[in-house]
């Protein structure tokens, strides 16, 4: 048990100028100037400009022949810089912690103080520079409208921890602004009103997003580290990494032993990625990663989709919200720990079954470990929310202006092949993406009934 106290300060200024001409051309300029106590004394302030340009092509004279069906066509382009503030408060300062060495004073051993963080007066903002182009459109009397955006974002001065010599440093590891990463992708949103009559209307929106990441660098002339790092470690007793973060490659790469079956001895059968040879599991495979480990897929969805529908009939309305993610794999951490006969507690019933359906069951000799068997296709499409409402007809009065009753359900159903509780994950740490943690509180179905009254 312990307690702590800390404080930090953030101050910012913002300015914006916009200009439009002839209802065709638009310019927006903005700048933010922010200062944070979390940065080093030499870099507490950051400036973040942005520029966006717009051209409404549909208002040009040469587009007059399209106005019977084209309501809006606008081309957009933008550039902007944003800054990221770290979560920890005192990364730029020397910090101390209680611990060894102990010293003997007047018959008692007393705990000493030790440095546990190097000062970094030059610590600065992580900055992301983004370029984007997009198009807005509307056709057929605004019955169909939407947008398409392409973006390219580069983040520099990302914080990473490095080994440093002692002395001159007080602590053998330090954080520094060195890393670089790239994100690029596409976002599409399409809206439509397929049906509209006096009593009935159906409005629908579909969204599509794809993002690709690439780690560009983790080293510079002053701070150097390996181009490959093993991350996303599982806890005891497995204590193994499940992913790699590698310069020149996308984030979220599953990396480990590829299992293809179970031997008659009840041990995993592992594929050698170089030769294709199938070998019975042994502990040396866990340390000889260069020989036995291989890429097992990615933890980050390639595609995110959404689909919302609103249907109105007289005083009734029905809203449906669908979401989906595709092109990724999930690590079922609970199965990695408990679908194994080496454990005597919380063992899953599936541990008594053959993982690959060939009659060979894992035996107690097979230690808990991470293999590809515990990765599952994470694709899903779910009805996230369903709401049915009714607007109560009211006689005109001075007390109540409107009244509506509704029933709503969240997390209604999910279409997926995933063998865990819920494929929609929300891990806060990007270095643990794709892990369905064994101690996660399960997603619940929620049902709500309500009454809204406007006075």
Regions found by a protein language model. Name each.
Residues 113-115, 285-290, 363-371:
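Short glycine/proline-rich turn/loop motifs
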Residues 176-299, 312, 325-328, 334:
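Gram-negative outer-membrane beta-barrel transporters
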Residues 86-102, 221-229, 250, 257-258, ...:
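Membrane-proximal, glycine/serine-rich, low-complexity loop/turn segments characteristic
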Residues 290-292, 303-304, 316, 367-373:
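Short, flexible active-site loops
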Residues 36, 325-412:
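Extracytoplasmic gating/loop element in the C-terminal half of outer-membrane beta-barrel translocons
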Residues 301-315, 384-389:
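Conserved SET/PR-domain catalytic core that frames the SAM/AdoMet-binding pocket
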């Amino acid at each position: 048990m312990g307690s702590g106290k800390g404080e930090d300060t953030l101050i910012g200024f913002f300015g914006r100028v916009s200009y439009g001409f002839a209802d065709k051309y638009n310019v927006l300029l903005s700048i933010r100037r922010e200062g944070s106590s979390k940065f080093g004394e030499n870099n507490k302030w950051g400036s973040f400009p942005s520029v966006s340009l717009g051209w409404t092509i549909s208002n040009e004279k040469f587009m007059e022949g399209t106005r019977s069906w084209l309501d809006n066509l606008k081309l957009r382009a933008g550039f902007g810089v944003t800054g990221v503030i770290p979560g920890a408060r005192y990364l730029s300062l020397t910090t101390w912690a209680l611990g060894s060495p102990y010293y003997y004073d007047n018959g008692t051993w007393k705990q000493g103080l030790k440095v546990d963080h190097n000062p970094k007066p030059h610590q600065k903002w992580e900055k992301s520079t983004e370029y984007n182009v997009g198009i807005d459109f509307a056709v057929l009397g605004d019955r169909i409208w939407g947008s398409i955006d392409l973006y390219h974002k580069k983040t520099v001065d990302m914080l990473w921890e490095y080994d440093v010599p002692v002395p001159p440093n007080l602590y053998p590891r330090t954080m520094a602004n060195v890393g670089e990463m790239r994100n690029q992708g596409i976002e599409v949103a399409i809206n439509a009103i397929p049906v509209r009559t006096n009593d009935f209307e159906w409005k629908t929106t579909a969204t599509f997003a794809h993002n690709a990441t690439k780690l560009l660098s983790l080293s510079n002339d002053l701070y150097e580290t390996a181009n490959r790092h093993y991350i996303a470690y599982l806890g005891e007793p497995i204590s193994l990494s499940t992913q790699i973060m590698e310069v020149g490659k996308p984030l979220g790469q599953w990396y480990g032993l590829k299992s293809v079956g179970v031997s008659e001895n009840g041990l995993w059968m592992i594929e050698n990625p170089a030769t294709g040879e199938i070998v019975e599991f042994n502990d040396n495979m866990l340390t000889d990663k260069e020989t036995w480990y291989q890429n097992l897929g990615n933890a980050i969805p390639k595609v995110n989709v959404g689909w919302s529908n609103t249907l109105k009939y007289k005083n009734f309305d029905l809203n449906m919200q669908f979401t989906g993610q595709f092109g990724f794999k999930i690590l079922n951490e609970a199965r990695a720990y408990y679908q194994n006969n080496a454990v005597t507690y919380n063992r899953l019933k599936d541990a008594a079954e053959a993982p690959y359906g060939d009659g060979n069951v894992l035996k107690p000799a097979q230690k808990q470990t991470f293999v590809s068997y515990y990765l599952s296709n994470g694709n899903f499409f779910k009805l996230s929310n369903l709401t049915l409402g009714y607007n109560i007809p009211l006689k005109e009065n001075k007390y109540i202006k409107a009244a509506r009753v509704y029933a709503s359900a969240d997390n209604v159903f999910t279409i997926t092949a995933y063998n865990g509780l819920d494929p929609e994950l929300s891990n806060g740490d990007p270095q643990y993406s794709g892990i369905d943690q064994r101690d996660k509180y399960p997603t619940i179905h929620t049902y709500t009934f309500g009454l809204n009254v406007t006075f």
